Amino acid sequence: MKQPIIVVENLYSSYDGKNYVLRNVSFTVNEGELFGILGPNGAGKSTLVLHLNGILKAKRGRVLVSGIDVRKNPREVRKLVGIVFQDPNDQLFCPTVREEVGFGPYNLGVRGKDLEDVVFNSLKLVGMEGYIDREIKSLSFGEKKRVAIAAILAMNPQIVIFDEPFANLDFKGKKLVWDVIKTLRKEGKTVIIVTHEAEYLLECDRILLLANGEVIRVGEPGEVLIPEILKRNNLDVPLIIELFFELGLELPKSLDDAKRVLKSKLKLG
């Protein structure tokens, strides 16, 4: 059985010391797990993510990453946890693609040919190797998002957190993000997807449902992605999930699986 790589215990978080954005949040993420954090806007998802790599420090409770207390050693934790933010403009700050993707590994001591290889291979993984000498400001939103992913992958973190990774992307962009996630899983990385869109979490091993700063439920997709629970917590119920529940079918493991199951049902019908 895989061991927890992230342990969150009784976490409380407040920006002003009075009003809590997170209240008594506790959960674990196992090594190599594809873990989803689901919640409506304002649930506290982004605040929780910032605690997981030490950008924010808990006033009450604690967060452990690979056994390291985030509050005591945030610098070490940031080497282990990479965050791809929802808006790449919040993450990218170097003039060129080459400089942006090379910045992290350079600061970790990678030099010369090794650095060139890391930059090229990270960009290749997101289909951006041909953009290596382009200026960041000349890129589209989707291209910037891919560079932001490459910049995190170049640092080879054990844990990669994607905050709303599918927002404002076309079908091709979403597929590319999924391909990256699948590659990371094959490499044994721990991947966390943070979103308000339930359909993107069908492939997760487990999902945490967060609302109003509190944990509502943690479990496998079939235990969390239940229409009445989603509605109760101000989340849209994807048509595909509603349909499977109405038909009395077990939730599919992916959107592709859902299409295959429904296609076979229609043929039988």
Swiss-Prot record:
GO CC annotation, single: ATP-binding cassette (ABC) transporter complex
Amino acids binding ATP: 39-46
GO molecular function, one term: ATP binding
Residue intervals of the ABC transporter domain: 6-237
Topology within the bilayer: Peripheral membrane protein
Keywords from the named record: ATP-binding, Cell membrane, Membrane, Nucleotide-binding, Translocase, Transport
EC number: 7.-.-.-
PROSITE patterns linked: ABC_TRANSPORTER_1 (PS00211), ABC_TRANSPORTER_2 (PS50893)
Keyword DNA repair: no
UniProt cross-references to CDD domains, sorted A to Z: ABC_cobalt_CbiO_domain1
Entry's family note: Belongs to the ABC transporter superfamily.
Annotated function: Probably part of an ABC transporter complex. Responsible for energy coupling to the transport system.
Name of the molecule in the record: Putative ABC transporter ATP-binding protein PF0528
Biological source species: Pyrococcus furiosus (strain ATCC 43587 / DSM 3638 / JCM 8422 / Vc1)
